[in-house]
Amino acid sequence: MNSLPRPDIGPFADTPEKRWVGVSFGAAAVGYDGVAALQREVGESLLAGIRHLGPPPARMLDLGAGTGHFSGLLVAAFPTAECLALDIAEGMLRFLRSHRPGADGMGLVVGDAEALPLADESVDLIFSNMAFQWCERLDRAISECCRVLRPGGRLAFSTFGEATLAELRMAWRAVDGYTHVNAFATRRSVEQELRAQGFTKIRLDARTLRRGYPSVLALMKELKALGARNLTRNRPRHLLSRHTLERVSEAYGRLPGMASAVTASFEVLTALVEK
């Protein structure tokens, strides 16, 4: 199968970490929609917030489009707009192209949120659901969004906040000295980055969603099925042993309120901003 085109305007930031992210999410494409209930819930709320926010866009970007679930909903919400679906994972866009009705009418682009292959002031609306947490530097991603937005353009995004997977983080700390959970942005740091890029009309909200799992292993398997990977420098480089899994499960069970059930917290930050 031929590769999807990479426009030659703007660089694709090709680093080992980014290649790893792209491969991980690409491999998760086939089963992603079956385990992405939280992502859909957050994205639907985000989409509802922009339906009546300003005039309809002429050109819009689904940044971190994944399997294209929200690309299709964006097209339905704004049928006269040109839609670009961009993702760092070529495997995701292959899935989108072959499984999403209307994909032929979208522009599919393999690209990096921190080096968008788009011209300055070329987009009216950027929608990004649960993608920014995988960026190496959030400031570069926000800067790129500001660059490609036209004056008056809107950016709507969601990302995980610092309290995400706090329980899993604490359980692992009781087991070893490695970093097993990614560090996520604080609400304050996100707002500071938006203001630093010149965004003045900012609506930034935070909420915590909690999900129950039959076991710690089930939680880990869901994270893996979503393509989520540990990007920290101090991550373990060895396979998870049964003994270690038992230890982290025991540590999780000792956390307050976890004796009879495994619950995971996901802090979600959502932003609606205008350039």
From Swiss-Prot:
Pathway: Cofactor biosynthesis; biotin biosynthesis. InterPro entries: BioC, Malonyl-ACP_OMT, Methyltransf_11, SAM-dependent_MTases_sf. The keyword tRNA processing does not apply. Its EC number is 2.1.1.197. GO terms for biological process: biotin biosynthetic process; methylation. It catalyses: malonyl-[ACP] + S-adenosyl-L-methionine = malonyl-[ACP] methyl ester + S-adenosyl-L-homocysteine. Keywords: Biotin biosynthesis, Methyltransferase, S-adenosyl-L-methionine, Transferase. One of its GO terms (molecular function) is carboxyl-O-methyltransferase activity. Converts the free carboxyl group of a malonyl-thioester to its methyl ester by transfer of a methyl group from S-adenosyl-L-methionine (SAM). It allows to synthesize pimeloyl-ACP via the fatty acid synthetic pathway. PANTHER family: ARGININE-HYDROXYLASE NDUFAF5, MITOCHONDRIAL. This is Malonyl-[acyl-carrier protein] O-methyltransferase. The lineage of its organism: Bacteria, Pseudomonadati, Pseudomonadota, Gammaproteobacteria, Methylococcales. The gene is bioC.
